[in-house]
């Protein structure tokens, strides 16, 4: 009597389903499918008879692999059945890399590929979006979908609180957040809710504390009305600052390996070009600009991590192998001093013909640093004056050779590490020796001339010809010839304007009107003026970058932020990139061979030394 029972039970349930509503039929069919689900060893006829009244949603849970037609209660069970039963494994010698779902016939080369392909046929969507709650079958599909939310907010790591990153505008989730994240770990309820009332007032647009890298700067709100711009600019600050430190380290390495000639202004300008506008490693924060323009965060000049509120947050250290030991820093400071002297020697050519305003106009009138006279620069490159938000063009800046401070010293002084023995070092008594400072009006400064001889000065300076305008350093021929050759080369095209000015004592009215109204002459003058201003800006930026690098190196030397030469790399707080394969108990090196931490370029030993 027991065999006909399974046949009567489905018939009674079919009659009940015909008289019920559509909603009840779906629920009844689900219960029916669960109650009569046969074992894997059951025949296919029983499974076909039980799945006949099923809806389209239940049809998706039927295995269509080579007419298997086995039904499963959940997508996970169906997926596991296909992977274990039909795909198989190489270890059991039954691996099948061809998809036989209906008429798919997709062939792969690895088991992982076909198991990922099976998700297309199985209604299994375990990967949910944390922003909108939408589910996806494969992780790569979720990754593509997550990129659509990038224009609304800055993405954070799934394991972190969405409010913990540097979000510009945190977006609350549109749907219920998933219980599991991408890694399968359970999440707390705090990540599924929007901004709570317990946060500080006005913090919706404010930058959030960084938990990603130690290079990120957690800027405090300066002005509540403009803090949204600060949060937006701080989002990508970590990558830019890491890139800046990499460029500085490359520059230090090239300078130590003598790939840059310290006496060649052209090579120095090319090597410093990537650092123009990107160098932001001051020892202290910028001043007098907080009320007008948001300033980027000054990067920490030490190699330690930045404090973070999350103890388990990932910290990032600043590796700089080229400036690791004290000898490296001293060597780099010496090379930077030579480069600074070379840049200063080319001030006459960089500032020749630039129309300037003297310090009496109120801009940069009083200065205490030896840096070139300039206004503060905002992150966008605009000039911000010390007394307010006032854009200043390059033409309105004071010339480094004519701007004299209140004490009588020139605005730009040479490096303190090099002592000038000739009469070409700018000083209070010799400041009138500059060709530009000897003209009375700004109109005559456009075309300066080089004197045939320099006047005698009471401090021991002798007469000098124009061919010897250059520093008298040591016996280096390359150093001595660089100044004189550059000065003679740039003085070639200057006699043409002097002929015009000398013959302009009795000009005709028609000629003067023609020269003023000619568009070709105006365009030539404007192009030449623009080129001179650009050349002056490049020279000024080179001087700023060199001074900033020297301040950084000197600051590390003063704070003793370097690795001791006698200290082993394991006991030092160096980065993983600085690991030395040599053992700390290695025998001492022979005399004449460089130790670890010394300069990177090879040292040529003289015979008999």
From Swiss-Prot:
It is found in: Cytoplasm; Nucleus. Residues 11-57, 415-437 have a biased composition (Low complexity). Residues 143-154, 562-581 have a biased composition (Basic and acidic residues). InterPro entries: pacC/RIM101, Znf_C2H2_sf, Znf_C2H2_type. Its main location: cytoplasm. A motif (YPX[LI] motif 1) lies at residues 447-450. GO terms for biological process: positive regulation of transcription by RNA polymerase II. GO terms for molecular function: DNA binding; zinc ion binding. Residues 405-414, 438-456, 502-513 have a biased composition (Polar residues). A motif (YPX[LI] motif 2) lies at residues 601-604. Activated by C-terminal proteolytic cleavage. At neutral to alkaline ambient pH, the signaling protease cleaves pacC within the conserved 24-residue signaling protease box. In an ambient pH-independent reaction, the processing protease (probably the proteasome) removes additional C-terminal residues to yield the functional form. Keywords: Activator, Cytoplasm, DNA-binding, Metal-binding, Nucleus, Repeat, Repressor, Transcription, Transcription regulation, Zinc, Zinc-finger. Residues 1-58, 143-178, 294-314, 405-531, 562-609 are annotated as: Disordered. A zinc finger (C2H2-type) spans 61-86, 97-121, 127-149. It comes from the Eukaryota. Transcription factor that mediates regulation of both acid- and alkaline-expressed genes in response to ambient pH. At alkaline ambient pH, activates transcription of alkaline-expressed genes (including pacC itself) and represses transcription of acid-expressed genes. Specifically recognizes and binds the consensus sequence 5'-GCCARG-3'. May act as a negative regulator of virulence to plants. PANTHER family: PH-RESPONSE TRANSCRIPTION FACTOR PACC/RIM101, PH-RESPONSE TRANSCRIPTION FACTOR PACC_RIM101. This is pH-response transcription factor pacC/RIM101. The lineage of its organism: Eukaryota, Fungi, Dikarya, Ascomycota, Pezizomycotina. The gene is pacC.
